Amino acid sequence: MKSVTPVLLLILDGFGHRLDGDDNAIALARTPNWDRLRRDHPYGTIDASERAVGLPRGQFGNSEVGHLNIGAGRIVTQDISRIDLDLEEQRFAGNPAFTHAFAAARGHALHILGLLSDGGVHSHENHIHALIRAAQAAGVADIRVHAFLDGRDTPPRSARTYLERLDAVLAECPNARLATVCGRYFAMDRDKRWERVEQAYRLIVDGEAAFQADDGLSALAAAYARDENDEFVRATRIGAPAPMQDGDAVIFMNFRADRARELTSALTDPEFDGFSARQLRLSDYVTLTRYGADYASLSIAYPPQTIRNGFGEYLASQGLRQLRIAETEKYPHVTYFFNGGEETVYPGEDRILVPSPKVATYDLQPEMSAEEVTNRIVEAINSRQYQAIICNYANGDMVGHTGNLPAAIRAVETLDGCINRCVEAMLANGGEVLITADHGNCEQMDDPLHQQPHTQHTTNLVPLCYVGHRPARILEGGALKDIAPTLLALMGLPAPDDMTGHSLVELL
């Protein structure tokens, strides 16, 4: 085994760089440790959004994109950009997975599922609109749209705009109609809260719902009257019941996998046991991108790109040991996404999953499981088993998404103590620390344009702080792609040729 300097990477999810603002949870929180680290150690900012991470211009980053870029050590062109290019160059409608589903739906219904917004994190309404038009042009006679409302990557009450734009598309396509509406809280869970997913499932599959409406806008107005923001709109059937039948085809239009898996499992897995689910014999089920190894039998419209010699794979090739650790909400990001969208656990790679608290929303427990994550990190550091430890702290993002400023402040203050414990343990054991974020969120908690809480990500730069025993400075102009090469340089290892990023810590 090579003798290297051990490193710890702390990824503070949703922790952007913004100096001022009376809605800035980071600036308002009491953070003596973070303040000291920024003051006494090399500190800078790096880019985590738009083209710097393979996204379209103007698109904020997210956890999946962030961890892909961090782990790859290069800009990874994101699925949204690949799909947008196909739309621009008029290849989208001819995608073989789509045309196969259109043919499979003849004599039956085609169900189009997806998050209806322009948030660009899990989906984009433009892709849904284009698919409806393509299905209509292909002669699909019965097209049913199941719209999941956002309010998390978009303002909390912004769905009217998206439903109006969908209505305009449906008016062009007489074979298509809106069949159901519900909030993403139910349809897009990722923490095995099956009681939520079941409500979306019963709505889509059985046409069962506590509420009915004649159209999407009426459904939304009724939900707002019940004081439900977009994310939490309860299952609502639009028009006559339209249950899913054997022989129907399904296309799930979310390009981000993590929040599409549970509903997909309920719809397709014959051994699904989260709740009582009907065994449907669908003619086709298309996922927009690959949702994981457990869904290998499903059709994929945009198969994954292959990323070789990312940070994890490269360390394994050098015979080094690494640890990935996060709580439930961000565990896939430090494992699957950090490894380039691969399920592979590399030789010498250990993983620790700390359960997230079972609360309805994380403003009810803004500390989340950060203390236990920290306990496990300190234990791992003191064991001296690992040459690299990769950790994600979820608090800034998950509490930031609630729009609750006091709770976000508590989340940041929790992180401040956790960061300090990790840094002290690492320095005591001869290691070095990089602290960064995958994207912004909790540094902006108010949306003055829409005059409501800001619950989505930001395009702000994110911090990069080096804490070690060597004098150094942070180079300017970096991005998330530079994190892996920086870690390798600190360890004393050359970066593989596949990595196009460069080290941002210049040792003096």
From Swiss-Prot:
What chemistry does it catalyse, as a reaction equation?
A: (2R)-2-phosphoglycerate = (2R)-3-phosphoglycerate
Biological-process GO terms, alphabetical: glucose catabolic process; glycolytic process
Give the matching Pfam families: iPGM_N, Metalloenzyme
Enumerate the GO terms in the molecular function aspect.
manganese ion binding; phosphoglycerate mutase activity
Query: Carries keyword Manganese?
Result: yes
Q: Which Gene Ontology cellular-component terms appear in the entry?
A: cytosol
Q: Which cofactor does it need?
A: Mn(2+)
Residues involved in substrate binding? H122, R152, D153, R184, R190, R256, A257, D258, R259, K330
- The residues listed in the UniProt record as binding Mn(2+) 2, with positions renumbered to this chain, are D13, S63, D438, H439
Residues the entry annotates as binding Mn(2+) 1: D397, H401, H457
Which note does the record give on the cofactor? Binds 2 manganese ions per subunit.
Enzyme nomenclature, EC number: 5.4.2.12
What is its pathway?
Carbohydrate degradation; glycolysis; pyruvate from D-glyceraldehyde 3-phosphate: step 3/5
Assembly and interaction partners: Monomer.
What does this gene product do? Catalyzes the interconversion of 2-phosphoglycerate and 3-phosphoglycerate.
Protein name as it appears in the record:
2,3-bisphosphoglycerate-independent phosphoglycerate mutase
